[in-house]
Amino acid sequence: MIIVDTSFWLALGNRSDKYHDVANLYLDSLSERLITTHPVITETCYLLLDRLGNYAQCNFVANVAAGAFDVFDLEIHHYRRIEELMQKYRDLPMDLADASLIVLAEHLGHGRILSTDLRDFNIYRWNNQNPFENLLLKT
């Protein structure tokens, strides 16, 4: 499974996004399932509605409902780790969506991610030491 950040969903949904074409090409070539978290879904819906309108938000929600990708369920015990991460990365600062993806990486045992957020996901470490591997924007 490949972890997906909000920025990937936004690139897919916005034809004028500079990463739109590369995100679509990557999506078309996938042989693995995608997985994200509820905080990422919430953030994506908010930003799609704000930037592109209700149709874009509803289209994304329809894909969630259709099972186009998996959704990791955060449990109460995960929030202790999320709070630790928010404290650790407070200078960025880190939001709930990004912290939830680190928890997901720790759960999966890998940091393979699709994101256009180069700054944050080049800094974040899962299990406090392992860097993320951004499959979308490999350099």
Language model segments and positions:
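Acidic active-site catalytic centers that drive phospho-/nucleotidyl reactions
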Residues: D5, E43, D98, D117
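Acidic, PIN/NYN-like endoribonuclease modules and their adjacent C-terminal/linker elements
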Residues: M1, L108-T139
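Short, well-structured N-terminal submotif of metal-dependent ribonuclease cores
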Residues: M1-T36, L49-V61, P131, L136-T139
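Alpha-helix/helix-capping structural signal
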Residues: S7-F8, P39, H77, R119
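Short, conserved active-site loops that position catalytic residues or coordinate cofactors/metal ions
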Residues: T37-E43
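Active-site neighborhoods of divalent-metal-dependent phosphate/nucleic-acid chemistry enzymes
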Residues: V71-T116
